[in-house]
Amino acid sequence: MFAVIETGGKQYLVKKGSIIKVERLQAEEKEEVEINKVICVSNNGLSCSSNAVVKAEVLEQCRDKKIIIFKKKRRKNYRRKNGHRQYITVLRINEISLQK
C-alpha cells in the first residue's frame, strides 16, 4: 500500500517504513505526527480518498546540506557568493489508514 501526501507545499510518494525529508514541522523528536492531507491511496488500484490518514514518527530535526548561491556579471568585477541551509524534519512512515 502506498500514498501520496502533501506537506510543506510538496508532494511525496510514501509507503509503510519509508523515510522521507520534509520541510520543518513543529514537533519534537520521537513524537508521532498525523498527516491529513493525503492526495491518493493505492492498495491494488488507485483510490483518491479524502478521509485517509498517514501516521509518521519524527526521527530527527536538522538542517539540510548547504546550497551555494553564486551571482556574477561578466566584465564588471561583480561576484557574490552566498549559502543557505534549510531546516528539515526526517520522518519514518508508520501507518497508512483509511478512515470510514
Swiss-Prot record:
Q: Name one GO cellular component term.
A: ribosome
SUPFAM superfamilies linked to this entry: L21p-like
Q: Name one GO molecular function term.
A: structural constituent of ribosome
Cited InterPro entries: bL21-like (IPR028909), bL21-like_sf (IPR036164), Ribosomal_bL21 (IPR001787), Ribosomal_bL21_CS (IPR018258)
Q: Name one GO biological process term.
A: translation
Keyword match Transmembrane: no
Keywords of this entry: Ribonucleoprotein, Ribosomal protein, RNA-binding, rRNA-binding
UniProt record similarity statement: Belongs to the bacterial ribosomal protein bL21 family.
| Task performed by this protein | This protein binds to 23S rRNA in the presence of protein L20.
According to the record's subunit comment, the protein's assembly and interactions are: Part of the 50S ribosomal subunit. Contacts protein L20.
* PANTHER family documented for this protein: 50S RIBOSOMAL PROTEIN L21, LARGE RIBOSOMAL SUBUNIT PROTEIN BL21M
State the protein's name: Large ribosomal subunit protein bL21
What species does this protein belong to? Wolbachia pipientis subsp. Culex pipiens (strain wPip)
Organism ancestry: Bacteria, Pseudomonadati, Pseudomonadota, Alphaproteobacteria, Rickettsiales
Gene from which this protein is expressed: rplU
